[in-house]
Every structure is written in C-alpha cells, then in structure tokens.
Amino acid sequence: MTALIKTSQSKISDTEITILDGKISIPKDYLRQKAFLDDTSVLIVSGSLIEGIGTIHSDIDCIILCDQRPNAHSIKGVEHAFVTDMNYRHITQNEDVHNTTDFYGDTSIHIDADYITFPEIEEIFEKIEIAFSEISSDQRFLYEPILTNTENNVIHRSIIGHALKNEERFNDLKSRIPLEKHIYVAHREKLPVFYAFQDVQGCWQSGNLWMGCEIVRDMMLKTTMSFTYLTGTTNKHYKWVYSNMYRIEGFDEIKHKFFILARQGATTEIECRSYI
C-alpha cells in the first residue's frame, strides 16, 4: 500500500525562512515588521510548514509572547488582512488584539500571529503540572481536555518553533515546558472510554453495523493519536494523525495496519463485521 502522504523540508537561515522544499522564501524581517514588538517581546515562527507537513495552502503560525497585548490603535500603522479579538471576531473598537492574519504576496500562504502574554504561558505550565499530578497515579477517563485548543497550540508551536526576536528568553522559556508531563496528559486524554466499547458490543449484537464501524474507527483514530503522543509528537489536531504516523521511525507493522484500516471501507454485513 502506498501512503498518499506528502512531507517537505523547511530551512531557516540568518535572513529568511524557506518552506516547501525551497519553493517559497519569506524574509525574517517581513515577519518582524508585521508583528507589534517591544524590547521584551519574543517572536516565534512555527506551524505545519515549518514542521514539513503543511501544504501550499497552509499557514505560517507566529506567536508573539508579550507582557501586554497591543490594542487596535497600536497596530494602526501596520496593514493586516484581519485583526481579531480572543474569539476571533473582527475588532471594531480600540480593543486588545489577540490575532492578526496576513497574506504573503501572490502566494496562497497566509501568516497567522497570536499574541500571548507571559503570565498566560505560566498558567499553561501550571495547568499541565496540576493535571499530571492528579492523573499519574490513577486510571480515570478524561472526558474533557485539560488545555484549550489555543493553549495546546502555544505549547506545540513553541516546541517546534524558532525565535526571531529575544532568542535567549525564548530558549529559557522553552526549557521550562513540562514536555514529558504534557505528552502523558495528551496520551491519557485521547484514550477511548470503555463505554464506547460497550456501544460497539451493542451494535455487533443488534446488527447496527454501520454505526459500529464509525465507533471503532473513532476509537482507532484516538488510540493512534495517543500512540503518536507517546513517540514525542505534540501536534494534537486530528487532521495530522496520518502525517504524524508517517514520520514515526520504526513500528512499521503498527503503521502499516493503521493505514490499511483507516482507508478501508465497509458496506455489507460481512465487510462491517470484518472491519469491526
């Protein structure tokens, strides 16, 4: 079976960032000019294109770590396609800026920048520490994620990212990420609950097999994501599970079986029971 998964190389030099095997280059100064930075700010460039799993329609993700977010008036002199608040709604007044979006030249690449304060980073670290201390000695199911999607993105993008301003401060902060604890918590979050297996038993016995196929498929995807976390992956978005599995070194039998089952269809009763 040929895995229809594409990866690419990215490079970061002293002056520019090159993505998609050299097809597109973005000057570092362009990213610096688009961000609102003060002397203490840390500018991080990151995202799936930096990882090498993004496509020509993916985005460059930037994080600006700051003491305080800029307000709308502060960034008036910089042209952006979108400026949004914490709920990603367009800003219409002089509010705090949480995110900006820009489109790079005549490419399909867009650049997303999130403003995150240093106290918020510390709160994320604390959340991970507390969650780990609470679950590391028991077997409870985690029905709700510990971190929000934004908080997970901050951790992941900090781990794979590169600093374009205040690199020393970034390296210090990065060294304090409780990475192994974060990975363990992520692993526990994705483990399927026993009640889902009971649903599968019910579907099997009643003949509700299309539903049963969907439940076991969801369980397989979650278990696979959990597995990728244990290998060191911190990208938690569903859509990257194939790329994450593809890039894992070793475990060829597990990877091969996953790719077959993930792409396998089932319509008839025999096919559905075989799949389940």
Regions found by a protein language model. Name each.
Residues M1-V45:
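Helical scaffold of the NTase/Pol beta-like nucleotidyltransferase catalytic core
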Residues A3-I19, D85-Q205:
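Conserved NTP/Mg2+-binding pocket subregion across the NTase superfamily
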Residues I50-E51, F118-P119, T234-N235:
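Short, solvent-exposed loop/turn segments at secondary-structure junctions
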Residues N71-I75, E122-F125:
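Active-site-adjacent loop/helix micro-motif of nuclease/hydrolase catalytic cores
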